[in-house]
Amino acid sequence: MNPRRQKRLIVISAIVLVIGAAIGLMLYALSQNIDLFYTPSEVIDGKQIGQVTEVPQVGQRLRIGGMVVPGSVKRDNESLAVSFDLIDTGPIVTVSYQGLLPDLFREGQGIVATGVLTAENHIEAHEVLAKHDEEYMPPELAEKMKGIKHVKPEQAYSTPKVSG
């Protein structure tokens, strides 16, 4: 091989190698920022992806959506710490959060929390979002929540009418 072709081959090989390394680093960085969406049942039992059941690992970042279990909200009087249970159609997952909860956060309402799985059924959230009206629900959660009766806030807090 003549020197000119050899030099050209080395330059092209180096360019391909640099581009491949850059693409690999970008994909690695993007994979670190992915927060997969789970329901409480999927956190405990795993999420079916094709033929494989994927169970989230302790330490994994994720988003979880479900209904806040009535009577499960526990607030710390000394700080902004709060914990509550989430449920869909199956197991219960406990969520801990340090901070102010959204104004629309209520027991029996749907929420989405972003955080880290710290135990098999416990999530340390760094963000909690409440749905903005009675009808909104993320599509993934709506699909999983079919069949669960939702009580509207007006019905939950209304007083019985007395007829005279």
Curated annotation (Swiss-Prot):
**Cross-referenced NCBIfam families, in alphabetical order?**
PRK13165.1, PRK13254.1-1, PRK13254.1-3, PRK13254.1-5
Q: Which gene encodes it?
A: ccmE
Keyword match Cell membrane = yes
Mind telling me which InterPro entries this protein's record contains?
CcmE, CcmE-like_sf, NA-bd_OB-fold
Q: Which residues bind heme?
A: 132, 136
Where is it found, in Gene Ontology cellular component terms? plasma membrane
Q: Subcellular location, in the record's words?
A: Cell inner membrane
**Cytoplasmic side of the membrane: what ranges?**
1-8
Q: In Gene Ontology terms, what is one molecular function of this protein?
A: heme binding
Record key words, sorted = Cell inner membrane, Cell membrane, Cytochrome c-type biogenesis, Heme, Iron, Membrane, Metal-binding, Signal-anchor, Transmembrane, Transmembrane helix
Q: Name one GO biological process term.
A: cytochrome complex assembly
Please identify the protein, giving its name as recorded: Cytochrome c-type biogenesis protein CcmE
Q: Which family does it belong to?
A: Belongs to the CcmE/CycJ family.
- Membrane topology, from the record: Single-pass type II membrane protein
Q: Which residues form a coiled coil?
A: none
Q: HAMAP family attached here?
A: CcmE
**UniProt keyword NADP, yes or no:** no
- What's its job? Heme chaperone required for the biogenesis of c-type cytochromes. Transiently binds heme delivered by CcmC and transfers the heme to apo-cytochromes in a process facilitated by CcmF and CcmH.
Q: What residue ranges lie in the Periplasmic compartment?
A: 30-164
